[in-house]
Amino acid sequence: MANIIGTISNDTLLGTSSADTINGKAGNDIITAKLGNDTLTGGGGNDKFVYNLGDGIDTITDFGGVGKGTNPTPGVIAEVDTIKFQGSGLTARNLLLTQNGTNLEITFEGVNDTKIVLNNFKLEDLDNLKASGTRPAIANIIFDGQTSIIDSFNVLDANSTETTIGIKNTVTFLNDLANNIIGLNNSDDVINGQGGNDKIDGLSGNDLLRGGTGNDTLIGGLGDDTLIGNADNDSLVGGAGNDSVVGGAGNDTLNGGSGNDFLNVDSSSGNNLLDGGNGNDTLSALGDYYGEVVSGNNTLKGGAGNDFLIADYSTGNNLLDGGDGNDELSVSGDYYSAVVSGNNTLKGGIGDDTLKAIFVTGDNLLDGGAGNDYFWLNIADGNNTLIGGAGNDTLRTGINTGNNLLSGGDGNDSLTASGVEGYRFDNNSGNNTLNGGLGDDTLKVDYSRGANLLNGDDGNDYLSGSGYTYGYGGAYYITTGNNTLNGGSGKDTLNVDYSEGDNLLNGGDGDDYLTASGYEFDEDYEVYYQTLGDNTLNGGAGNDTLSVDYSQGSNLLNGGAGDDALYGVYSTGDNFLNGGDGFYNLLYVAYSSGNNTLAGGASYNDFVIDYSTGNNLVSGSNGIDYFSAIACFGNNTLNGGAGNDYFDISYSSGNNLVNGGDGNDIFNTFGATGKNTLNGGNGNDTLTGGSGDDSLTGGAGIDTFAFNSFNQGIDRISDFNATNEIIQVSAVGFGGGLSAGVLQTSQLRIGTSANTSTQRFIYNSTTGALFFDQDGNAGGFAQVEFARLSAGLSLTNENFVVV
């Protein structure tokens, strides 16, 4: 810190980098204060104060102004002082003059650490005057790069009644009254409103208009204009051209007009209206990364053109309307700083728009309007609504906790409410509703913990509430909520694979594919994950495929109208498969371990429970049904119902109950080792026992009891009718020289054993035992009982047929 005092002569005084006090005294002095907040006194004479960019806050105690008017007296001229600014940005266009009480503060727009305070000085006393007659030019301020007055500026005094500026391409400072002033055509005017409620019209040219304090109206006119409202409630109209329009702290109205405009009310607390007009505009009501938020309720209207509308770091309830064109709309915060807490409305309008809401806590509405729009809602806590509108839209939400509504509208849309962000997996816990609307839509709530509702509506839609497993024994990213998926009309795919919830899937009209499956193999090809919930799958009208493969839950599958295929392969739960109406149905639960119930439709059904270990109940209906329970371990019940049915329980080991019902049924138990019960029911049935001791009842009708070999257990035939029913034997399986056709008379013996070498079948009418002897009474083969009939039957060779 230095105290520097000049002489009464013309001194050149240089300060230090500290806060100095410099007094030039009399004479025409040149004072350069340098860094630090300095106090400067020129003394008498025409003094020049040299100020460099970033020198700090300097105070001049006795600055001599030009004064009012354009003809200062010789006495005034003798005391006029000059400030010489040096440094980038220290120009007349950037000059800002602020009357703060009795002092005038000089700063520059966009320049930091640069300020001069003129003590006891009025704004109207500051001016630059060009030479006039015999009077030379006199200047209070010379700007960077100048040696004389080039960029002049003009200050209207407090009594001025001017309605227009007088000089083209100049800088004008108004007084603190309510001024109504216009610029000049074809002139790049800079007009500063200062205080008062001013109306400033730049006319044509690239103008810079500043409102200052007060409720101002700024009109840019034709040209690329810059309008700055500053404090209070301002109306800013850019007009034609590419304009920059900046509001302030009040409730401002900004209109860009035609052209590619930039409208800005960043960090404002007011309720502002921004209207871009025609052109590709940028509208900003932006807070900042460091926590300074926009707190007002702002309205941003893009108008025609490809516009960018942003209200990030905002706490107000904002409306962003893109209008026509391909627009981008954003109301977002960030992870480290602020979140958007208001209830915002984003409307894309006509065009291919992008709508974003990230790190938001309010209940927001995002409406894309017509066009192929893209929506991104992430890290959201509120209950948000996303509406795609007409067009092929993409609606995507990420890690959210609210109950969101996503509606695709017309077009082929993609709707996703999944809890996954890049390579970071997390869950979406809200209860979301996704409506596809018209078109072929994709709806997903993968990795979700909420109870979601998905409606495909019209079109061939894909609906998914699935989870994910990662690698051999890796992480599970599972959907846990109880979701409802409605396909609607069309050929739809509904998927809740890798889910832990109890889901409801409704295919609706059309040929649909519904699945609640889930499996993943480890490195030894062992299944280590299955779907866990108790799911309900309803195919609806159409030829549908329903699958709960690799499921641990007890699932209900209803085929509905149409020819359906229902699967529960490798499932462990107790599933119910109902084929429903249709001409043909396939019900397939092979390799399952649960106790499943399979109910066919009215016509043709195929039932497959092969290689299952549970005790299954399978019921046909009135049609022609096929039952396959090959190599099963459980005790199954198979009911054919009306119709000509075929039952195959070959190689099964359980004790099965098979009821043919009405119709001409065929029973095959080849290689089955359990004690099976076969009931033919009404109709002409063919019953074949297995390797175990089976119970065969033909029921009403003319039945055939078939035997493939004599050494496959002793089967009990409870109701054999000797007048018209047949015992069918295999020539290959029995041997003994049997020939195809009706058994020869000599090959049947009624008694306890054979008494000739030609006799092969011996019926003990006292006990009902039926034996086979390959060589009759030759003695080389001991007779084997292979069936037990009722006693006292009048059997003849006509009751036996060899095949």
Regions flagged by a language model, labelled:
Residues 1-11:
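Short, intrinsically disordered N-terminal pre-domain segments
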Residues 66, 100-101, 123, 721, ...:
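General N-terminal targeting signals
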Residues 181-183:
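LRR N-terminal entry segment and analogous cap-like coil->beta motifs
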